[in-house]
Amino acid sequence: MTVTGAIWRDQLTADERAVLGRSDSGVAGATPDVLVVGGGIVGVATAFACADAGLGAVLLIETGRLGAGATGGAAGLLIPEPHQWSDPEPFVDLERASLERWRDLQRALPGGVGLVELDWLGLAPHDSGFAAHQPRDVEWLNPGQVAELVPGLARPMEGAFIRRQGRVNPLRAVARLAARLPAVVTGVAATSVTISGDRVVSVGTSSGAISPGVVVFATGRPPMLDGLPLHIPSERVKGHLLVTERTGIRLPGIVAPVATQIEDGRLLTGGTFDVGDETPAVQPDVIDAITAGVAAVLPRLRGLGVAYQWCCFRPRHPDSRPVIDKVPGLVNAWLTSGHFRTGILNAPATAAVLSRWMSQDVPPVDARSWSATRFGAP
């Protein structure tokens, strides 16, 4: 599904928008050392990491425009530390490492990737509103301290305050990375693979065959291609987000469960789980519920208009963790899928894992956590 209605494209420069539709040349007969299939943030970050590691000629192909799917509909929040309340340790370790890689990219690339550093404040009626496990790097605030940061709450709240988290405009990050890739072709769909023994020897596309040295599938959900014997359980989960009109109300970064302060005095909120809704349309009742929920916590926001509203489908595996693995039975094919709510956050670390695996034959730490076979036979 191509995401429409999100704010992110409107924030881009003309040059950044042009990169999202970049198409360098035809693909028929191409023989890249590395072929990356998928032009969301994970695919683009992987292609960038492979090129940066000197893995040879790297080609990325994408069915539509870069970032047109779940990437373009994401909130772009980079908040590993709050995940300590909900995610297993290997996942949190990956998230922390990935935020550091976002910071590295911001420093290393001319103009950066659009990383914005900001703090996270989680609200609760009392500290037992958080899990008994108390994460590191958390400042526990009493209701008076919370009220100083967020005046006008509907009721006294305690809070968990975490500094130095981040966010990006996901399309800007894609455009900044993709601008430095050696070869990108949009508007080309992978349709099939040809396997000889334990190797992919050809990837069929809507524009002809490609013969890669290695291939990485980063297509959101696991690839479903003729000739590729791969069956990993997954689903897509719809979610809604919105951005408000400009307001003089300022939040101290991300305030959960209220909103995130973004540019131009606007607030970003939402991130629903609309399980069972397979329609591509924005549902007005869901948008109304989001705005009502925000106003119930912070009444000052009641009546604030909605400037942007959109929905997207996020890929999810049964355990809500991604797959980062070799394609079972093949020595020159990798895949990553099911990043669900953390694809933007985890893209650079996932890319680093894959490029290191390809170049040094070193799988990730705790490989079982990311295995394609953890659900049974693929």
Model-derived segments and spans:
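Helix-loop-beta segment of a Rossmann-like dinucleotide-binding subdomain
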Residues: 111-122, 137-178, 272-276, 331, ...
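Extreme N-terminal leader/targeting segments of oxidoreductases
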Residues: 1-33, 52-53
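Glycine-rich FAD pyrophosphate-binding loop
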Residues: 51-72
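C-terminal catalytic lobe of FAD-dependent flavoproteins
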Residues: 304-378
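Active-site substrate-recognition segment that forms the wall
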Residues: 48-52, 76-78, 112-116, 209-210, ...
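Short hydrophobic core segments
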Residues: 34-37, 61, 203, 210-222, ...
